[in-house]
Amino acid sequence: TPLFQLERAFPQLNFTDPVELTWAPEFKRFMLVELGTKVHLFANDPKATDTTVLLDLKAAKPEATRVYSFTLHPQFVKNRRAYMVYNYQIDEDKRGGTRVSELQITRELKADLSTEREIITWVGGGHNGCSLRFGPDGMLYISTGDATAPSPPDGLKTGQDISDLLGGILRIDVDARDKGRAYRIPPDNPFVKMPGARGEVW
């Protein structure tokens, strides 16, 4: 007798390359991210047959290649702010970047890309990451990949390098701004006062 048996929770729904599934209490629905640049909402109902497309990034931004994560601001009910992280192609040589952006969600449950505001970017390629989560402290936590191919591992030698943003966890405050930045580096981050280190690294 098997110890467990897998069953489809939503047998009527099909997705392509799903990479993230979260419960969004603000919508009273599940929120699912497809790698191919779409974000869906659907009811917590085994009989659900359709979804609401909250975001179709590639339709609006052809340079976008992948969406990895999508999350709502802790005060979303008041400010309608959401955050996404995606890859984009920089030029015809297919060099890429990874971008975290803020945008507004309309009352009709559509991402308004005209409100997009870039928060932070880093080089893309290979392992890009990434996941976004707000902590109980209200800070935005961002996981980043090492931006290189799997073989050899950590080809850019960035895994233990805190002088860049790659291969780590970042912690930033999106409700305030430092001069020249679209965010604030929290003063209690561990490497803020270390010469040569990126203060965003957590």
Range-by-range predicted roles:
Residues 141, 155, 163, 192:
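Short glycine- and Lys/Arg-enriched binding-loop motifs that mark or flank ligand-binding interfaces
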Residues 52, 148-153, 189-197:
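Short glycine/proline- and charge-enriched loop/turn segments
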Residues 97-108, 157-175:
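Beta-propeller blade signature
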Residues 174-177, 185, 196:
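Conserved small-residue
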Residues 155-159, 196-202:
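Active-site rim elements
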Residues 113, 179-189:
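Peri-membrane helix termini and adjoining interfacial loops of integral membrane proteins
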Residues 1-151:
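Acidic, Gly/Ser/Thr-rich repeat motifs that build Ca2+-stabilized beta-propeller blades
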